[in-house]
Amino acid sequence: YEIVTCYRNSKNFGDSWVSAGYGLWFLREAKYLNASRMLLGTSCAISGTGFMFSHRILEKRGGWHYFLLTEDIEFTADNIINGEKIGYSAKAVLYDEQPVKFSQSWRQRMRWTRGNMDVLRYYCRRLFRGMFKGSFSCYDMLMCICPGFFLFGFGVAANAVAIVENMTGHGSW
């Protein structure tokens, strides 16, 4: 792998329930998402500051062009679209200090939400195209960025079909 992410751990796990929550989230992300992706042979996702990449990746992209609020997700999406697979190293551990107050966490999560929306705006079309070209990694990335949008879209479409069927008399209700 020329791009590798690590196990991101909370430096201040015991300081508050908020920082403990972050630690549990990182554990979930590492063990149940990235480790599973490695077993399946699909691309992992970078989350936060604990990652590395080869100089070739930087040259191939023409430098560092990732400046959205969630540049880690942006970097992941762009590389997945371009066919790169991101690996995961469980032995590489980064200890990151996390918010201890709910208000700090809320502000951070609002930034991340905005960042994910920006990534979606810039990369959704290409991820969607990649998904239909057979890239499970593109599908996985879309589901990580915005699972609610796809579930909402599916729900709207299913209800629209049901309404039309019932209005035309083809529905069995």
Enumerate the language-model features and the residues they cover:
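Basic/Trp-rich segment in TM-proximal cytosolic loops or flexible interdomain/linker regions
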Residues: 40-42, 100-173
